[in-house]
Design a protein with these regions (language model features):
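Membrane engagement elements in two modes
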Residues: 5, 16, 30-32
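C-terminal motif of bacterial Sec signal peptides marking the signal peptidase cleavage site
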Residues: 17-21
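Contiguous segments within soluble domain cores/interaction surfaces
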Residues: 23-120, 124-141
């Protein structure tokens, strides 16, 4: 009888540990919006786990939604970060590598931002009006 009680107690304890671990994993996947802009009826959002862009390697999400917040199917998109020339510093253009996801209108972006400071995120995509473009100012820390 004592062994049976110990086994049941151990099974319950393991179940709590597994549930706690699953809860932590699920909450870490949420991303925070860095910036959003509109192009026609489409809202374009740039997000990351931290809600920031930093100097160096960045993993971002580029999303396209309609006025109701529903995903807009975008067959092709590009993302480039531009910093104009300043003084002796030449202009910088950091192109993101985009990959599709299982969600329509959502792309994963990987980009190496060369320096801290103000950048212009330049987005081009195939929308309902043909090739559309949008820009948004972002700050790399």
């Amino acid at each position: 009888m004592k062994i049976r009680t110990t086994v049941i107690s151990l099974a319950i304890a393991i179940s709590f540990v597994i549930l706690a671990a699953c809860g932590r994993t699920g909450s870490s996947s949420a991303e925070k919006t860095i910036k959003s802009t509109k192009s026609g009826d489409t809202t374009i959002s740039l997000s990351s786990a931290s809600g920031e862009i930093k100097s160096g390697e960045n993993d971002l999400t580029l999303s396209f939604t309609d006025a109701a917040g529903k995903p807009v199917d975008v067959p092709a998109a590009s993302l480039k970060f531009h910093m104009p020339a300043m003084g002796a510093m030449a202009e910088m253009n950091d192109v993101a590598t985009l990959t599709t996801t299982d969600t329509p209108g959502k792309f994963r972006a990987r980009v190496n931002i060369e320096a801290e400071g103000s950048w212009e995120a330049m987005i081009s995509f195939q929308g309902s009006l043909g090739t559309e473009q949008a820009t948004m100012g972002v700050n790399a820390k």
